[in-house]
């Protein structure tokens, strides 16, 4: 796991106009994590077009532009491990989520189908599949989903390890 950047470090990195191949799968930066404190909207477009997952830490103006927001750096190691072990799948997932944000439901389902078929034919999925059923996951009496509806926002939280 790389050390998360401050917002100033993140801004400086982007100001140097790095090539997109320096981020995402097959690069030293399969993801970028930065502290949202002090952030402004100046990097919104870059974040929206980046090839890798963008992880915001804490609170700040760019919170809604990040692919994932965590409360603090304690949550980063597991996320970092998963992205680093599955960089193509991570990239496909964030690109899917970004694309479907602006599409109609029927078109979103088509794009989702393409994304999942791409992942399921990939080497990461083929390596993961034989391991899937070997680990017995704990069962919970809690509901499988937590659904929270507030104003125009709908949050659906998966509550199962499998």
Report each predicted region and the residues it spans:
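Terminal peptide-recognition signature
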Residues: 93, 156, 160
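C-terminal alpha-helix plus adjacent terminal tail
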Residues: 1-152
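Short, proline-centered helix/strand-breaking motifs
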Residues: 53, 161-162
